[in-house]
């Protein structure tokens, strides 16, 4: 079997050579695009891995499809579209992870009852924090609790951007970042920074959802997986959290 990083490189080449993508844009922003693809790649890896795929049922398909559509919109020059799809993916994933946590809890205690979820992200956040408190150690998994809160912060920012007025939807030229501010009220660096942060928070919720399985993983395998998307320090920190080590 090929090393995971080799598979990633192969799949990334396929990704940036999809039909109708903007080649000049990809060439000048390849490192940023690679970060985007890296995060989606490891989400897909965990989704299909024998040890962790039980956390991803058919209802997760919507979240993953939205992530793929958002990344394709990015490569084809649809700035606002890519952020709108990313926000939809974030919203779908937020509810999905909470519903999975609830399902796992009910497997241990079928008598548990939970408040219904609605479309309001802020209300879901309150229920999220309340529901996991009895089962998730807020010291060991403090980063999980922080990610739940950060997701709401970035969701609000995305909402403000995708609902802002614009006369350029979508911008289809390879130079579209020259007009990015008018389209999204973000400059190029801010755009990618926000995109990466939202993707990171989507991943983190899924990562901590899988904590019971990941605790049993070989640290070397987990390191090589996370290293595709994160730096060495961040990778080691995430491993220590699920392993329960300081």
Residue ranges and their predicted role:
Residues 1-79, 84-85, 99, 105-246:
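A cross-kingdom marker of C-terminal helix-rich interaction/assembly modules
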Residues 85-86, 93:
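Internal, conserved structured core segments that host functional sites
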Residues 91-102:
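Extracellular-facing segments of soluble proteins and assemblies that are Gly/Ser/Thr-biased and enriched
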